[in-house]
């Protein structure tokens, strides 16, 4: 009898663990304006990604080399772009892609596309990265070296937030993939902009190169998951229709 009880308890424990693969946090049930997906729908980045490079490994030496390369760019025009790219809040992600997309992506000029991008931002930036970030709690470059980033606005808050994978990069790459689907004629410029958003995190000192590389995988997986969500599908269709109408003018 005792064995059956213990076995039942263990089964319940492991079943709950399997269901709770993604750590608890905000999702579509708590912030529907920033998420399409619920916790249980999200990809598990901890299972998807390999561990981050260990200090002293060849991969980490590459991270350090890329950090130094990025640091040397901070006083250049590319460095200024990295500083601006650090702020993706309050429509910042839409603004970042407006040039590559071909016209302003704003709530006024393209409301359906703007809603699509702002509503998916944390599906890619938070939900898709959460399990790996919280498990590894990798130290960020600026904290590792005890230096400042190129944009110190979020430095204190992010000093206690895991570096691997990069949430900003996941947002940028996921956004680029979706925008390239809406406007395939500009896909090269859009994808290049999405790639550079990730590199801006290395230049700024907020992330290691391996954080950024991993985040592009996570961002791609997040977009694949979003395409199975009816609410996302509906808003994507509206954005495509809006774009088609604007293109005819």
Curated annotation (Swiss-Prot):
Compartments, as annotated in UniProt: Periplasm
Pfam families, sorted: PAP2 (PF01569)
InterPro entries: Acid_Pase_classA_bac, Acid_Pase_classA_bac_CS, Acid_Phosphatase_PhoC, P_Acid_Pase_2/haloperoxi_sf, P_Acid_Pase_2/haloperoxidase
Secretion signal span: 1-20
The EC number(s) this enzyme carries: 3.1.3.2
Catalysed reactions listed for this entry: a phosphate monoester + H2O = an alcohol + phosphate
The keyword Membrane belongs to this UniProt entry's keyword annotation: no
Noted pH dependence of activity: Optimum pH is about 6.
Gene3D superfamilies (alphabetical): Phosphatidic acid phosphatase type 2/haloperoxidase (1.20.144.10)
Primary subcellular site in the record, as a coarse category: periplasm
Entry superkingdom: Bacteria
UniProt GO MF annotations: acid phosphatase activity
Keywords: Hydrolase, Periplasm, Signal
Subunit structure: Homotetramer.
Family: Belongs to the class A bacterial acid phosphatase family.
Name the UniProt record assigns to this protein: Major phosphate-irrepressible acid phosphatase
Organism, scientific name: Morganella morganii
